[in-house]
Amino acid sequence: MRAVYIKDLKNEIKKGLITVKGDKAHHLQKVARVKIGENILILDGRGLTVTAKVESHGKRELQVKIIESNVIEPNKPSLDLAFCSPKKNASDEILKIATELGINKIYPIYSDYSSRYPFNQERVEKLLESALIQSNNPFFPKFNE
């Protein structure tokens, strides 16, 4: 089942329908090629998961009807990850895998032998979002720089 991440999902629900707009709708239509009648999974990153059926689609939006919604409790104990920052590509891989494994908080640490480069917060959020969708993880990790 294809998944999509919508940050403010509770605000998007109107009479049992959700409108997926912009790049997310484009991705579902053109890249994932979801069809009318197909089910998708919508995640809000805070434990709310919604299974929805595609009702209609326009140029840059998708109307979906809610079939089922679940609120998942966070894992206890909370899993945190602190890592010394290696090269940039390796850091990206660490962030992706940590998200897929269900890590709640990620802390990059700078030491004498680690790479020192600033993390672009927007880029990190896109990496975490893609890993969240890939793994259907209902919780978006916090990245504390």
Please provide the spans of the model-predicted regions.
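N-terminal positively charged helical leader segments and presequences
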Residues: M1-V71, E122
